[in-house]
Structure formats: C-alpha cells, structure tokens
C-alpha cells in the first residue's frame, strides 16, 4: 500500500483536506471522487500505478476530512470553484492531469471546458452527466427541495466498521473483505457512543432544486481542449438508471473533440475498486501517449 499524507488548505472559507501520495518532481495527477465518497477511495488505483506520479485527491466540501459547507444544502457550481482555487494552490498556472469518478468526472469535464488551459489531459470514469430534464419538472423539483430542507436527512448508524464493510460488500460483491474494511474505515467515523456513521454531511442527500440543463453542460464539454479518456464499466447500470439509452450515451461522448473511449470488463460503476489494475493500465497508457 502506497502511503498517503494529509494536507489542509483554506479554500473559499473552508478547511479543505487533500490527500497526497507524494512523488516530488513527478507529473501531477489530481483525482476527484464521487458523491458520498472520499479521497481514500482511490487508494487501490494509486497502488496499481506503475509510473511515478505526484498524486493529489481532495475530499470535496462536506465529505471526509474537509469541513462541511455553511449552507443547509450543496450546490454543484461550488465544486467547480473549489477545484479552481485548489489547482491554483497546487500548481499555480500549470496544467495538470485531471481524473474524476462519477460526480468528480462531471466536475472535471465541466471545469476542463471552462478553464481549458488548466487541464493537460482529462480522464472521466463513469461521469456522464444526469438525466435530461424538462422545464415542466421545475415546480415538483422545487417542492421536493423545500420538503427535504424541512425534513433534514440523516445517516443510519452502524454498530461497527465491520457492519459498514458488510454493507459495502453487499452493494458491490466484487469488493474483497480487505478492501471493504479499508473503505469502511475511511468512509465512516466512530462516535462517542461507539456507533459508526458515514463521514460526511447528510445535507448532500438533499435534491438540487435547479434542474440539470444538458444543453449548458454540452456547451462546456465542447470547449474542452485536452485529450479525453472516457472509461466505463462493462457491468455498470448507472447510465441506464438515468434513463439514457445507448444512442444518448454515444451522443454525450461525441461532444468531446479529442476523445478515446474504453470499457473495463468485469467492472461496474465503482470500476476503480473492481478493476484498479486495468483502470491504471488504461490511464497510464493514455497519459504517456
């Protein structure tokens, strides 16, 4: 296991945790985790890299060891702004290799279109956007948001890290017991009563009242100048759950001018857990090209 370090930055008024697997002087890679995840989730991928990389991975606001947001809900544009400030702290004006999974992939793809000069190469792991929406959906969405703000979501407690690890294995049977235990101890924290809860702000569960506007997202994607590697898991059901068919999925990939597409066998949405060696091989081949 490659050892990581914890660093903290003041980012837009929040104490931000950034995990670093150091290799001073090597090319920088920045890894962006998904919804309800943490930076340590990339440990297996980092362990599988063969080349020397200086790797950084933030915990997004309200996740892991980063401070919770000061509002009662979270907004997608904040991730883009947080990333911009963080990259300035890590690399000043230099371009970096950006790798994002799921939510992190969506942030990375948007950012690479808004700040194309900051991204040398872009790897998107299962971050293909959200379901398209219609303006007529707005009243119901706002009503749901107001209801969830009043109800204030929470996380269920677990009796132990072992119980949380068991839940992770039920959700993803490909996880080995060792990997599930590792993830549980980074995803969870133990309270004074001994119960384990997820290490994050439950407000992340509150729906975004602003509809997903694919036309705006697509306009950003089309401005990406960096080469893009788009990797999905052969057994992933994520885009089907969003109601996207194969033609819509292909149309989204086609928005990137310089895209290479790869599919990882025997892997689902959490492909960096299921097949980290193959994902690392694809990434390093792409970055070296």
Language model regions located:
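Alpha/beta-hydrolase fold catalytic core
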Residues: 1-29, 50-54, 92-94, 129, ...
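Active-site loop/oxyanion-hole signature of alpha/beta-hydrolase fold enzymes
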Residues: 9-14, 56-99, 281
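Conserved HGGG/HGGXW glycine-rich cap/lid loop of the alpha/beta-hydrolase fold
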Residues: 17-68
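Conserved hydrolase catalytic core segment
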Residues: 94-137
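A catalytic-pocket lid/entrance helix-loop region that shapes and gates access to the active site
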Residues: 125-158
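Conserved alpha/beta-hydrolase catalytic His-Asp/Glu region
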Residues: 153-214
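Conserved loop-alpha-helix segment in the C-terminal half of the alpha/beta-hydrolase fold
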Residues: 223-267
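Catalytic histidine-centered segment of alpha/beta-hydrolase-like enzymes
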Residues: 264-276
């Amino acid at each position: 296991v490659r050892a990581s370090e914890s660093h903290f930055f003041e980012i837009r008024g929040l104490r931000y945790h950034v995990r670093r697997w150091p290799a001073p002087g090597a090319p920088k890679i920045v890894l962006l985790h998904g919804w309800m995840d943490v930076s340590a989730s990339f440990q297996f991928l980092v362990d599988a890299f063969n080349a020397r990389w200086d790797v950084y991975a933030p915990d997004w606001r309200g996740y892991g060891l980063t401070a919770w947001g000061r509002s009662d809900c979270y907004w997608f544009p904040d991730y883009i702004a947080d990333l911009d400030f963080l990259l300035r702290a890590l690399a000043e004006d230099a371009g970096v290799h950006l790798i994002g999974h799921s939510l992190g992939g969506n942030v990375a793809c948007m950012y690479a279109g808004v700040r194309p000069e900051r991204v040398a190469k872009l790897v998107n792991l299962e971050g293909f956007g959200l379901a398209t929406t219609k303006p007529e959906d707005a009243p119901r969405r706002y009503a749901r948001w107001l209801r969830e703000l009043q109800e204030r979501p929470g996380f269920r407690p677990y009796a132990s890290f072992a119980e949380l690890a068991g839940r992770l294995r039920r959700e993803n049977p490909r996880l080995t017991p060792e990997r599930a235990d590792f993830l549980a101890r980074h995803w969870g924290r133990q309270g004074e009563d001994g119960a384990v809860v997820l290490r994050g702000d439950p407000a992340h569960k509150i729906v975004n009242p602003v509809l997903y506007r694919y036309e705006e997202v697509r306009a950003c994607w089309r401005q990406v100048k960096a080469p893009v590697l788009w990797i999905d898991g052969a057994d992933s059901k994520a885009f089907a759950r969003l109601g996207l068919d194969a033609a819509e999925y292909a149309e989204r990939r086609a928005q990137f001018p310089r895209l290479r597409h790869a599919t990882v066998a025997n892997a689902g949405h959490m492909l960096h857990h299921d097949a980290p060696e193959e994902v690392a091989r694809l990434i390093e081949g792409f970055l070296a090209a």
